Each structure stands twice: as structure tokens, then as C-alpha cells.
């Protein structure tokens, strides 16, 4: 949690006092997995904190276990704050199975882009679409991505291509999974950066935290890039929402009123980083108004390309429209994608080393993932 938020809240209060319980810091030298295990043990034993900062947690898993309160009733009961004052797409993205887990103070968007003549003019694609793009552009590569990285990125939002979450079953004996293997097999096992390959890549990653950063990508790759988004099962436009200072209330808390007062204080007295995307509509509009008041005018701040230093300019209406379209299609990462991706990676490592046939590998993946799903259910 932001120490500044806590200090300011504690100064404003006589009734409540917030302190930090750190599960992973310099004093205990725990790994992330060890810290997460300790947190889940506390949640199970009734020794959990009153609030969680969800920034690095498996939010879907916490909702499945029923350990996070829905914040909508808190908003509904409070006359000092209104959920309608926050960006709808962000609120929707942070609502899992009907539970509003948090309203983040700020966020970053992660996505992928490519040249329009290679990936098409519109956002959104499937694994089949990627395979078709590669067939149509045989000289293209995947930036400097390794086989492992590409597999994880493809499956992050498209795992439902092979998983039926309603029935709890999987099917990897499909043409699409075969195409996935064909996509990643030519990739290296270790990264080897090459500016030339980056220029001829089918897709590259893009990270945005304000309305001006997109200028770097236009300057480096040209104005004809399309922010394609993550690969999904249905080909919808999808961009990753990475949250910071996203506080939730633990369902077993004995001080829920105090926890809500802290969350409300943080949202109303938003002291998050100047210039980062805000979940607050008014603050977002202030950012836009500031840009458009000087649209196109050069700024003193710079970024660097192969040709040298380039000055940022205040964002134009077109640049803002592009970014706003991304914001309208943000999603949190599905929880089980990483676990299933790890299973697939382990088995494919052996396959690519020649340890077993494709048919044997698919059978093992099918059995292991089905067991994983059975255990989760």
C-alpha cells in the first residue's frame, strides 16, 4: 500500500489507524510464492489483514474463495462518493463474477501492435488469425520473443479456446492447438535482441500510462501501426489492465467500516502519480483537457529513437481517441491462464527437444490440464 496514503489517512483520523503487514519485503527475504502461501494461510486461518492491495495477487482466485467483499454496496450506502464518478470500463474490468473487487487509483495499459498491412486495420484477433498473418507474411518474426514468452502471451487471454469453464473440461486435440505449436516452434529458447528483427516483427509490445507515450511508438515504427491487442478465443479487442494501489476489503475483516473509510479516503484524496491514467473520470478529463488546450505543441520532455532525441508534443485529438479506445477495452488477466500455461510449457519443452512425439505430448497436456481443472473445481 502507498505509505503516503496511509500517513495522510492516519493524520486525518481519530477513530481508525492503518498499518502495513508486508508479506514480502527486505526483512524476511521470502520469494513471491512463499509470501503468497503465507497470505493464503492467514486468509484460511482467520488471521488475515482487513484489506489487501491487489496489485500482484491472483484476484480471480481470491474471488473464487470468497475472501473479498463486493465494494458496490459500500458505494451505494455512502453519500460522499459515487461509483458513477469512475471510468466504466475500469470498474467493469475490476468486477469479477459480480464482485467489484477494487477501484484502482491508477493503472497502466499493456498491449501489442503491428503494421496495418500485416495484421489488419482493426483490433482483436484469435490464434487462427495469428497463424494466417504468419502465412501471409513469411518474412516476419516475433520481435525478440522466446518460445516461452510467446506461449504465455498467446494463452494469457485465449486459454478459453481450449477450456470450457462452465463444464470444467479442456480439449487440446484441435487444429487450433496444432497451429499454436507451429507458431511457437520456430522461436528461440533464449532471447537474442536484434533491432532489425524488431522492425520486421509481426507484433511488438506497447505500454501506455498517459496520453503522450503513444508518440514514441509512432516515431519508431510509423503512423500506420495498429494496436491489435491480446489474442483471445473470440477475437474481441482486449488490452491488459495493470492496476496500482488497488485496495480490497477482506470478507472476514472485523473492521470493514474502517477499511472502507481508508479506501474512500484514497479515492477522494487521490495522490497517485501525476500523469498516470486515473480511474476517476474528472481527473481523466482534466488530463485530456490539458492536452487538447495545447494540442500538437512541442514540449520540453523528450524520448529517444535510433535517429536521436525527439520532443513529445501535447496529444492531439486523434491520439487521445486511440488511447480512449484502448481504455474502453481493458481487462484483468484471467487467473488460471498462468497455471495452465506452465503445464503446457513443461510438456512442450520435452517435445521441442525431441523427447516425445506431438501426439504423446498433446495427450499428456490434455490429461494434466484436465486434472488441474478438476482440482480447482
Question: Can you name each region flagged by the protein language model?
Answer:
Residues 92-194, 251-257, 357-360:
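Helix-loop-helix "hinge/cap" segment bordering the ligand-binding cleft or interdomain interface
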Residues 182-261, 271, 282:
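Extracytoplasmic/periplasmic substrate-binding proteins
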Residues 2-17, 344, 362:
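Short, polar/charged alpha-helical segment
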Residues 30-48, 52, 60-61, 135, ...:
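Short helices/loops that flank or line small-molecule/ion binding pockets
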Residues 277-346, 350:
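Long, aromatic- and glycine/proline-rich binding clefts that accommodate carbohydrate-like moieties
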Residues 17-86, 220:
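Extracytoplasmic "Venus flytrap"/periplasmic binding protein-like
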Residues 14-17, 46-50, 99, 137-141, ...:
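Loop/turn elements at helix/coil->beta-strand transitions in domains of secreted/extracellular proteins
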Residues 57-111, 224-232:
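Hinge/lid segment of periplasmic solute-binding proteins
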